[in-house]
Swiss-Prot record:
This is Large ribosomal subunit protein uL14. SMART domains: Ribosomal_L14 (SM01374). The keyword Metal-binding does not apply. PANTHER family: 50S/60S RIBOSOMAL PROTEIN L14/L23, LARGE RIBOSOMAL SUBUNIT PROTEIN UL14M. It comes from Rickettsia rickettsii (strain Sheila Smith). It comes from the Bacteria. One of its GO terms (biological process) is translation.
């Protein structure tokens, strides 16, 4: 579960490496974000020459969490890190590649574009 001040890895090639959650979107009582939720993040670490700079504020879609997700058949999928994909104002991915696996639950949230960019779908 991701909350304010959580540090996350960036799973795309936008140029950012680490970001910090500054707001969880989705209502006044939405305190934590889970897999597939959109949050507002600030870039804390970026590579030189990338599309984003340190201090920039973007939306991000969470694609991997340490908490994981429970499937309807009872199986659980957990990851070693919390990771997200940066989104622009139109909720489209900034990067052109997504590194690492993503889950099938993103299809239900209408993020098929990110699933097609990913290396592996679990």
């Amino acid at each position: 579960m991701i909350q304010m001040q959580s540090i996350l890895e960036v799973a795309d090639n936008s140029g950012a490496k680490k970001v910090m959650c500054i707001k969880v979107l989705g209502g006044s009582h939405h305190m934590v974000a889970k897999l597939g939720d959109v949050i507002v993040v600030s870039v804390k670490d970026a590579i030189p020459g990338g599309k984003v700079k340190k201090g920039d504020v973007y939306k991000g879609l969470i694609v991997r969490t340490k908490t994981g997700v429970v499937r309807p058949d009872g199986s659980t999928i957990k990851f070693d890190q919390n990771a997200l994909v940066l989104l622009n104002k139109q909720d489209e991915p900034i990067g052109t590649r997504v590194f690492g696996p993503v889950t099938r639950e993103l299809r239900a949230k209408k993020y098929v574009r990110i699933m097609s960019l990913a290396e592996e779908v679990l």
